[in-house]
């Protein structure tokens, strides 16, 4: 968000971020969201509230196809946990050639130009993209229409990366099975937004990374950067001001 200020972007100083500090929690939430829909938690909770005893089949995420869109630190944490749960993981990223060939958590990595073909094969699409001009509404109506009717969309990246009007349409008309959203284009999300009332939309409120040790994790990252500065060492987590992350 700071890079939206022209004077900040133009300044010669090096900018760093807290990349990696909160990725573990976001990785957990990404897999949790998949399990929420697979295990039909919403139906179970509804029956409990109504004092109804129901028995119904539930799904498994083992053996299912996950596509991670945005394979940076957060996306890799999602993939690592999904792979451990027996999922088959693929990824889409801006620079697929930068993927570590030793990475055993993904079966294949493709570029943005192959996004629609990739989502068409996935049971779960987990978006972990940064907010840039290139990613703005990258998940649009065409991408959502390419997804399976049984698939679920999860967003642990930035709200601006999804066309929310198109997503409301997809959820309302059951073009996809569900969505789990931790981030939104406008925050706080206005109280009259359709997401609040859609039964096939799971929401958390940009707090999937807000763990009890959040500030400690952020401070550890700051201390690391401060030590690098004092010791004259190269900074970790340097932000590319042109790319925006």
What are the roles of these predicted feature ranges?
Residues 96-194:
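Rossmann-like adenosine-cofactor binding region
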Residues 43-77:
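Glycine-rich NAD(P)-binding loop of Rossmann-like domains
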Residues 14-29, 43, 185-245:
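C-terminal helix-to-coil terminal segments
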Residues 1-45, 59:
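Phosphate/diphosphate ligand-binding glycine-rich loop within oxidoreductases
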